[in-house]
């Protein structure tokens, strides 16, 4: 197995709940998702975010099968789940767990970070470089993000090359960049940005995105609607922390062996 294959294997094991042991004392992911729904509802009512308060809820029935219920509609059995997950985990649509492609409102003279595609690290890194720009010059026609957001390339071949990062230490906490990015913003104290980053770099997510590409050859993209409907496995928050720590240590060991 090559180092690249090993890295991919680690991330796939991680999102399937096979990298660290489950702790029965952890608060289950279902409780975490309920907090997310409550926070999302509050933000929508306060006008701080746009969206509908009718999320889908995915649960395991008495027959051990998963069902999805959207609003007042009848539950629908999910036949296309990609793999099994531990009982303390939960499945969720990305649109129901994070904000996707949010926008920012700032004073025109605010200095922010500007990130081009070439400045975003690929592979299994978490890196980027930026230029300083005034908000007036980048507020229109570009993607918006802020500290703590996770961004990833949506266009081929940058998507397959895993160009993605957690944006932190931005100028005045905000940034803008290439329109060829999708932005994921976790709700406060819910899903870890580190877990989101490793999820979008996982073989499952990359292969799913490739299957959903649209557009002409050489200009294919993972569209917003397809991203929103992506199924994501969510561990309990405590397990997310253990997972991310384990991934970091294992990737460091691989990097050390390569040097």
Where are these regions (language model features)?
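Extended, domain-scale alpha-helical bundle/helix-rich regions
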Residues: 6-76
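Non-catalytic DNA-recognition/assembly elements of restriction-modification systems
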Residues: 9, 18, 76-104, 237-244, ...
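Sequence-specific dsDNA recognition surfaces
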Residues: 74-80, 95-106, 118-150
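Short, well-ordered beta-strand elements within core beta-sheets of diverse protein domains
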Residues: 81-84, 182-186, 228-234
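Extracellular/lumenal ectodomain signal focusing on beta-strand-rich modules
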Residues: 88, 96, 147, 229-231
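A short beta-sheet element
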Residues: 140-201, 213, 223-224
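Specificity-determining recognition surfaces
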Residues: 202-230
């Amino acid at each position: 197995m090559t180092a690249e294959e090993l890295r991919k294997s680690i991330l796939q094991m991680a999102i399937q709940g096979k990298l660290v042991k489950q702790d029965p004392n952890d608060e289950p992911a279902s409780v975490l998702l309920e907090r997310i729904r409550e926070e999302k509802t509050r933000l929508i009512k306060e006008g701080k975010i746009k969206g509908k308060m009718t999320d889908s809820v995915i649960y395991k029935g008495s027959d051990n099968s998963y069902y999805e219920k959207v609003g007042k509609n009848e539950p629908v059995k999910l036949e296309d789940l990609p793999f099994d997950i531990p009982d303390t985990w939960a499945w969720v649509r990305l649109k129901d767990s994070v904000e996707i492609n949010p926008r920012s409102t700032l004073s025109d003279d605010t200095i922010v970070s500007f990130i081009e595609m070439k400045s975003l690290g690929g592979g299994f890194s978490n890196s980027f470089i930026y230029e300083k720009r005034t908000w007036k010059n980048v507020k229109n026609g570009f993607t918006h993000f802020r500290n703590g957001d996770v961004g990833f390339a949506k266009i081929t071949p940058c998507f397959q090359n895993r160009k993605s990062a957690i944006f932190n230490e931005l100028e005045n906490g905000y940034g803008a960049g290439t329109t060829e990015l999708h932005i994921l913003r976790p709700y406060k104290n819910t899903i870890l940005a580190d877990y989101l980053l490793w999820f979008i770099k996982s073989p499952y997510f990359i292969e799913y995105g490739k299957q959903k590409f649209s557009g002409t050859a050489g200009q294919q993209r993972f569209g917003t609607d397809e991203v929103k409907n992506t199924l994501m496995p969510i561990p309990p928050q405590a397990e997310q922390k253990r997972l991310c720590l384990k991934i970091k240590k294992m990737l460091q060991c691989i990097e050390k062996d390569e040097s």
